[in-house]
């Protein structure tokens, strides 16, 4: 099994360098299905692979939605119909990718996790992928995805608060994405600002304890938290006139 595991990690690294992310994901799924605790590197390879696979489709969906709005405002009904059909194709792909990683997390990654750090990592991921579903789903499906996302982020936060330092990049990344969830999915800028500010302030207070190896990662996420706070605060002051679509929130 060790030889097979080593081979799949190598193939995943190779696929990443070749920017063949679908294959990167397949290699890492093979390791996840061995039901072993992943190393930090393996965990990151899973995350990077899926982030790229989903990221391309999320970008496509946003572009199509924007074009659809423009065509709608011009009254081009035929074009709007065409875009809707095309957008549905992208949504089907998004749904499939999210379902795939969510089942890997639930069936293999979380059950094999033995540390607080990896537990936070996987629950954060779970929150992220339910959030991506909530971005484009409607009605009950959106409500369900939002609720599942909230549950996963809350579970991650509970473990992060007890097991990880406020300056830990995974805890900071969780706060960043959880606050984006409040802002974009639950339309709650006040809650988003509170969460982001609390995470930022707690990290600042313990900056001395920042380890050298995570210094770059932690300070980068802190910068993103601050950027979002600036954007969201001005949004609140302007009474929500800030267009969320024009400027994407920083995410981890």
From Swiss-Prot:
Organism listed in the record: Solanum lycopersicum (Tomato)
Record text on subunit structure and interactions: Homodimer.
Family: Belongs to the 14-3-3 family.
Alphabetical list of InterPro entries matching this protein: 14-3-3, 14-3-3_CS, 14-3-3_dom_sf, 14-3-3_domain
Pfam families: 14-3-3
Taxonomic path: Eukaryota, Viridiplantae, Streptophyta, Embryophyta, Tracheophyta
Gene: TFT7
Matches recorded under SMART domains: 14_3_3 (SM00101)
GO biological process: protein localization; signal transduction
GO cellular component: cytoplasm
Name of the protein in its database record: 14-3-3 protein 7
